[in-house]
Structures are given as C-alpha cells and as structure tokens.
Amino acid sequence: MKNTAAIAAGSLVAGIGYASLIERNAFALRELTMPVLTPGSTPLRVLHLSDLHMLPRQRRKQEWLRELVSLQPDLVVNTGDNLSHQKAVPAVVQALGDLLSVPGVFVFGSNDYFAPKPKNPTNYLFNKKRRIHGDPLPWQDLRAAFTERGWLDMTHVRREFEVAGLQIAAAGVDDPHLKRDRYDTIAGPASAKANLTLGVTHSPEPWVLDRFAADGYQLVLAGHTHGGQLCLPFYGAVATNCDLDRSRAKGASQWGADMKLHVSAGLGTSPYAPVRFCCRPEATLLTLVAAPAKGPVIGSRAGQAHPTASVR
C-alpha cells in the first residue's frame, strides 16, 4: 500500500510539474482550412488570437507572438482576455508588434476589464454562474493602443471593410460571460454582398451564437474556453467555463445549418491556475476558402477542416 501511495503521489507531482512548467509554455500554431466564403471568393488568411492573459514577465510568450507576423496573415482577429496584470498593456502591444499593422478586429473579455483572482476550481464544474471580479484593468489603454494602429473595435458595432480584395461584413458583442452582450444593437441580416460575414465574441455562449446564425453569418470566432485547459485522454475537455458543450471547447464545428464556429484554445492561463494538460496553448491560422454551392448537412461537424499543429 505504501508503495502504491508513493507511486500515485509521485505521478501526481510529475503531472503537475509537466502541466505547469512544460505544456503551458509549449506554444503551438494550428493551421486550419474552412470553406466559409461565398462561392468564387479567393482564399483569406486569418490569424485568430485569444486569451493571451499576459503578464509583463512572460518573455517566452511575447517572443513567440512576435514571430507570428512571418505567417503574413491578411486579417488578425483577437477575441479578448489579453491582460492578467495592471502593467501588461505594453507587453501585449510589444508582443503583437507588427501584427498591429495588419488589418485587425477585436473584442474584449472579462480579463481585459478585471484582473484575475483565485477561484475555487469546482466552480467551473458546479457553479458556473458565479462571478468573482478582481481589480479593474486598463482596458481603455489597450483599446487605444489597438485602434491607434488601425485595428477595429467590434464591441456592439457592425462594420464593412475590404481585406485582400474581399468584402468583409463583421459584427461583435461585448463579453457574454459578464452578461455585457447586447446583441440587439447589431441585430439584422448580415450583408448579402460580402464575401465573408464574420461574428466576433469572447465567450461562445449558445444564445449569442444562435443570434449570429439566425442573422445569416457565415463564421463566428470566439475564445474564453482555453480549450478546456485541463483535458483527459479519450474524454477531452473537463469543462468549458460557459454553456458551450465540451465537444466544441476548441477548434471548428458547425452551428446550425449554415454557420461555422471556431473556438480558440488560447495562449495563456490565469496566473492562479498556471497549468495546461492535453491542451497546448495555441494560435490558429485559418485559411478561409469558398464554400461549395450547396450548404453543409445540418448537424455535421466541420469535417472538411483538417488541423495541423507545429511549434514556432
């Protein structure tokens, strides 16, 4: 019995060490092709970033982010939770670097507005509705830094713009996790003239996704879930920290008859839970291509999208 207990304790310590020291710093780039553009459209390269949860001292993460500009994306989409510290805005801006010169859109999440706090981990499973906010974060400074470089704030607005010769009609909401979403401010049919109709939200709450789908959006990008952060082999994400089902905790899926969803597993963690297991931190390069003339089968997964991962 003593030997068994010692082995179990040793395995637990090793697992925690791996999750906290190795995997959470093993940044990966996923590449995914999604057929969502109107027929006849040329491909569009979209870099999806989310949940940086940046601390000023996280040099490895900052250096990895700076290299992503070499991917030459046409558009950057940032789905929030950039900050984990009052003084992290300069670190985020410096890490994004030349990506801020690429056309971009963004919305904020709870950890752009409020600093993280220690939380009971069982709340993620049994008390998801409870919200514990930390001190206010300098989100106004972050928004100013993004918009001054040309990124578009999508919080409760609809915008139409051109990227790489394609017309994009985008709309976004404030963080549904904080109940800040006001979809009625952007409600209405998506533009029929656009090559891409894009919805942007931090937390992929089903009630928001349903509204985007009902308005005819082709693609919604979201973050928040961290891909589950702690996943189990052959089971997947233990929790999503929202009302989205576990099977959609990260990656591409079909939502309704005509809309695709992509949820980023994100690049960071709360400083009070600095672990990842079977869920590497990631950025995703989405190659959006023209959809076939006939729509996908209702209820199908995004089976045409085959992700590949590489470390950069």
Predicted features along the sequence, with ranges:
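Acidic, His/Gly-rich catalytic cores of divalent-metal-dependent hydrolytic chemistry
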Residues: A9-L29, W255-R312
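N-terminal active-site segment of His-dependent metallophosphoesterases
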Residues: L12-A95
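Active-site neighborhood of phospho(di)ester-bond hydrolases with catalytic His/Asp-centered motifs
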Residues: H48-S50, L75-D81, P103-S110, M154-H156, ...
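Core catalytic region of metal-dependent phosphoesterases/phosphodiesterases
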Residues: R60-E162
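Binuclear metal-dependent hydrolase catalytic cores centered on His/Asp/Glu-rich metal-binding motifs
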Residues: P118-W151, T155-V157, V163-D210, A273-R276
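Conserved beta-sheet core of the metallophosphoesterase superfamily
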Residues: P204-L285, P292-A293
